[in-house]
Amino acid sequence: MTHADVVEGVRAAIAAYTLALDDGRTDDVVATFAPDGVSEMPGMGRLEGHDALRAAYARWTPRRPQRHVVANTLLTEWTDDDARAISDVVFLLQGKDGWSVQMVGRYDDTLRRDGKTWKFARRSLTPIE
């Protein structure tokens, strides 16, 4: 597996998560995680495993249009089966007066290859104040 293959797979996992999250597709969000995957976000605590992830993300389906804009993804470590990446994220929410920034933060991701796709083993969000 080449560096480019890993980068492409990691970016695809990040995009799949983001699109599913913004569209409110809970099962598709959960599918981006390994079965024992962990999500850590302020206000959510530590969620481990598909059942805990599904229960939490089902409560956070969007009630109005939203977008998580992810940029500057950098692969920091990788092997053929594991990878670490960091990305910046801006969370936008549409209100009656248009779109507004709700949060700026950084994802710190550990991913594991599952066949041809990459899954989150751990996804941590740190807001930037």
Indicate residue ranges for each PLM-predicted region.
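Beta-strand elements of well-folded, non-transmembrane domains
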Residues: V89-G95, P127
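Rossmann-fold NAD(P)H-dependent dehydrogenase/reductase core
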Residues: G9, E48, A52, A56, ...
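Short, low-complexity N-terminal intrinsically disordered segments enriched in polar/charged residues
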Residues: M1-D27, A31-P35
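A solvent-exposed, acidic/Ser-Thr-rich amphipathic alpha-helical stretch
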Residues: T26-V90
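Short beta-strand edge/turn micro-motifs at domain boundaries
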Residues: D82-R84, R106-E129
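Short, solvent-exposed loop/turn segments at secondary-structure boundaries
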Residues: K96-S100
